[in-house]
């Protein structure tokens, strides 16, 4: 965000929607004077708005920026969630829709018959995940309507910053636009 956008410019007023806000980002963005910052989550006490990502209580084309990191892998109907994200994003708006991804997989794997937490952890990487995304994730976002840039920032920043920010080497981040 710092390198590629005007997100941190005080003159650039942005309406931001942040799903399942991470503590470190929450504090930073809440104090950012140029941001009209709204957090949402179905369960988190940090959330300004308690909402289901598949049925958002916001008007169409409302947000300049949407941050949704490591949420979609928990959502049974991720297509509906992606459609809702697209709906509330303004034309020209930016969405960071990061997920855990297995780039060795061509296609996403989901199986809703797997309900045992230990089995989910083994297969999907965490007990409350309902799928493991493959390389087709970016195309799924495109099929919703997003323009997607696939960014590997770990190849563009110093190794010590990769370590500092706990980035996974080679992780591809979808930078999406409407």
Protein language model regions, located:
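Cys/His-rich short segments
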Residues: 1
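Short boundary motifs at domain starts and secondary-structure transition points
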Residues: 5-10, 164-165
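Short amphipathic alpha-helical segments and helix-helix/interface helices
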Residues: 6-7, 26-30, 82, 135-138
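Class I SAM-dependent methyltransferase SAM/SAH-binding core
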Residues: 8-55
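A short acidic, Gly/Pro-enriched loop at the edge of an enzyme's catalytic core
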Residues: 53-66
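A short SAM/SAH-binding and catalytic strip from SAM-dependent methyltransferases
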Residues: 64-76
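S-adenosyl-L-methionine-dependent methyltransferase catalytic module, highlighting the catalytic core
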Residues: 76-85, 90-178
């Amino acid at each position: 965000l710092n390198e590629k956008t005007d997100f941190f410019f005080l003159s650039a007023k942005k309406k931001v929607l942040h799903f399942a806000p991470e503590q470190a980002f929450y504090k930073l963005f809440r104090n950012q004077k140029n941001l009209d910052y709204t957090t949402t989550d179905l369960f988190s006490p940090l959330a300004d708005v308690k909402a289901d990502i598949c049925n958002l209580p916001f008007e169409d084309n409302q947000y300049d920026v949407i941050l949704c990191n490591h949420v979609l892998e928990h959502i049974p109907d991720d297509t509906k969630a992606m459609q809702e994200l697209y709906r509330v994003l303004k034309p020209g708006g930016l969405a960071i829709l990061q997920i855990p991804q297995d780039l060795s997989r061509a296609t996403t794997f989901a199986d809703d018959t797997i309900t045992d937490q230990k089995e989910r952890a083994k297969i999907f990487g965490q007990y409350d995940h309902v799928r493991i995304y493959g390389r087709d994730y970016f195309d799924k976002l495109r099929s919703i309507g997003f323009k997607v840039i696939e960014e590997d920032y770990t190849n563009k920043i110093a190794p010590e910053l990769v370590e500092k920010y706990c980035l996974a080497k080679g992780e591809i981040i979808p930078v999406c636009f409407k």
